[in-house]
Amino acid sequence: MMWKWVTLLLFVLVCGDNPVNAAAHNPFVCCHQKNETAHTPPKKAWSLVNAILHSPSQCNHTNVALAYFNTTKGYKQVSCVNGFGLMSFCLALFDRLLTINVRVADQKFYDELLGYKRGFAAQFSKATTDSSGFKNNLELDLITTRHGRMASKTHVAGLTRSSASSQL
């Protein structure tokens, strides 16, 4: 199963038209639309055509992303998705490629993702991880308690108090 994701990422990197953008100039569509107007995107990740990750300063440090999906009717559907899930997925793929000695073709993109991760981690709180007020279709409850509520305290393993603000 992992080889399919590695193949997909390699295809995207080789083609040179990266479908996931990490740039500060992207539109803020997901920051302003409420979740009651959301349309459920297609269930298959393979239908993802393009995605825009917002920088930490956008959307009041809440991590939401804009995603474009192909539909069976031949048009593209725009949806807002959980930015933590998408960003973490991309970083995990890059990290996996690096562990098997595959050179990351788009080092600038990888570095921007790491910078965004650090920026979101610096402002990480219960308020900034609650994207329920936005038009957010792919809810991935990454940090929840047993009863489905957001955890009020977090811990990043491997950090000391002095390095917590500069590293992940």
From Swiss-Prot:
Q: Quote the HAMAP family the UniProt record gives.
A: HSV_GL_alphagamma
- Kindly give the membrane topology term recorded for this protein: Peripheral membrane protein
**InterPro entries in UniProt:** Herpes_gL_rhadinovirus (IPR020175), Herpes_gL_rhadinovirus_sf (IPR038313), HSV_GL_alphagamma (IPR034708)
Provide the family line: Belongs to the herpesviridae glycoprotein L family.
Record note on quaternary structure: Interacts with glycoprotein H (gH); this interaction is necessary for the correct processing and cell surface expression of gH. The heterodimer gH/gL seems to interact with gB trimers during fusion.
Q: What is this protein called?
A: Envelope glycoprotein L
One GO term of the biological process aspect? symbiont entry into host cell
Chief location category: virion
Q: Which organism does this record belong to?
A: Alcelaphine herpesvirus 1 (strain C500)
Q: Where is this region: Interaction with gH?
A: 25-138
